[in-house]
Amino acid sequence: MNRKMQVAALLGATMLGTSAWAQEIDEIIVLSSPFKKAATDVISTTEILTAEDIEGSISGPLGNLLDSLPGVSSAGYGPAVGQPVIRGVGGYRVDVMQNGMTIGDISSTSGDHTNTMSLFETEQVEVLKGPAALRYGAYAATGVVNGFNRHLNADTEEGTDVLVGFGDNADETITGIFTRQGQFSLSAFSQDADNITIPTHGESEAYHEREEAEAGDDGDDDHELVDGEQEAANTERENFGFTAAGHFGDDETKLSVMFSSSEIDYLIPHEHSDHEGHEGDDDDNGHAGDDEDDDHHEEAGGADISLEQQTFHARLAHNGAVGPFNSFRADLTSTAFEQTETVEEEDGIERSEFEQDSLHLRGEFAGIFNDWNTLVGLEYRDIDLTAPDHEHGDEDGGNDDGEEEHGYLPNTESTQYGLFVFAEHEGNDWLTEAAIRFDEVELEAAHEEEDEQDDDHDHEGPVSFTLTNISVGLAKKLDDNLLVGGSVSSTERAPSQVELFANGEHHAVGRTEIGDEELDKESSLSTELYIRKAWQNSQMRVAIFNNDYSDFVFLEETDTHGTFNFVQADAELYGYELDYQTDLKLGGRLWNASLSYSSVTGELSDGDNLPAIPADKFGFGIGTSFNAFDVKLDVEQVADQDDTGEEELATDGYTSVDISASYQPPAYEGLTLNASIRNLTDEEIRQHTSPLKDKLPEAGQDIRLTARYKF
């Protein structure tokens, strides 16, 4: 602790020598907007990360990149997984897309499944809320995370981009190359990282105390936490992928095609499914061995998740008259996805496989009618998920006992048809946005014959939902620099295949999940008020929101240890977000500074707290440029989270400090050298949104070096 305090004091004294760039949002075009408007002219709340913002987080999961944004958090499951959480919810309420189309992975089906978006190829990421989000489908009720792949951008400049990097925390290496020549582009990216190093014991003190209390006087269950830097077993990860793209046609009509292939292999800490209290192998998070002098032990097995994905994306854009419309765009995405999970249980190996084929089609017509910019779209999605019965074998992976059990999910097929209209109008200092969307969603599971009479699966045939979503936003420009407005959205969401059909043990996460085919559609009435102000070299955004849910779907633990049911209850989430950015002139130098604060509260109708609601967080950044150097400092302070759900432990707050400096040698045009330190003070960081928060903290101090050459 003394070292942390000394470093923090030093940073406070020298703060003005470092920086964090303020985002010039008024100069950034919102690509997710159908009409490509500036962020200041879009009523829907939008957060934007540019290529410069993304560059420092290429190696991390998507959630880690977004975590610094107001109202956005990450639900991590080890260093390879970070699912985005928007205003307290994620999963099937937040649609993660690439260029407005489905990615085709299975990250939403479980917290341990990673997202496959390639950040190396991504030139901009947008978090979109409000009316414009309805453009993107029935599972975008809370928001959309939309990444834009530079391969699909027909205007990407010609040239080559080469990246090499190293991170000392996990002996991580990354390499990447992107080249665009004429109308064709090609890229490849690889990452290899060993186990992460954490600043202290894997178990949180609160979890350890509860486990010790439950264990009682059983001496075999006693073990001490080791407070010191140690390696976290079962946190390795590898990633390799390549992409090729081409553009054909002219400025009026253009066909763009892109093919990508990726392979990801990562380990996650695993708790044995029959674990109840400390059994001598409870340190499945891989730290703090009981009888070894090493910093870690590997007595407990991990879950090895390997996935492969191939995606084909085609886009036809016509910038000319099509009947009464001014332009037309059609997108097609076809994805083949495979994932294998291998888990070391005490009595052998458990292996589960997932295969998913998905097809996504969207056609959009844009035009102007009575001074209203209007977009009319049609959408079709078909997802065929095959989840074969998992195998139980010996330690060598052989299925020597011939035992097969039903998998976590049955084979399922889901189909969605959508029709949507989005319109906006600007006049007399008023901005208006309106959207309406109709969806027909059908989901069907192929249950085993012997289960047809099971009470859990007494529904025959497909489950269908008819959804109507409406959103309206209105804003007033009080002057050229002040915008006040709000939006109201009525949304409906169909339960997912997991929430409906799950019926078994998900070995990778060590719990049994039971779906309910009788679940109703989830509905929400969302309201938001905001103010945006710009003056001189400063700008401020404040948003207040409330989401009132009917039949909110969530997991609830049963009386049987390790078994969870998907249930429904009314719920409410509300909070606020603040973002302030300014330019300062200090010591004859221009500084960019930013402040942010966000808070969200989630409650069930009976007054109980919703689980995994992120804690309040405060962010601060300051930075400057001089000669060929850019330097920056980012500080994030997260409060304690004591408003916990049933059986959920409180999470201590933390303060994380990141610093970085980049240098562009004048003699080597196109070369950028970057040095950064993440978690400078080696803070114990536990995200309340993470299912592993009480088993594994975030990585400790990480010194990173990268070199990037563009020519």
Q: What residue ranges belong to the model's regions?
A:
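Extracytoplasmic beta-strand/coil segments of soluble accessory domains associated
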Residues: 63-105
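Surface-exposed extracellular loop regions of Gram-negative outer-membrane beta-barrel proteins
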Residues: 272, 336-338, 395-398, 442-458, ...
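Flexible loop and strand-edge segments within Gram-negative outer membrane beta-barrel domains
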Residues: 233, 251-327, 335-358, 389-412, ...
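Short acidic/polar hinge/loop motifs at secondary-structure boundaries
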Residues: 102-129
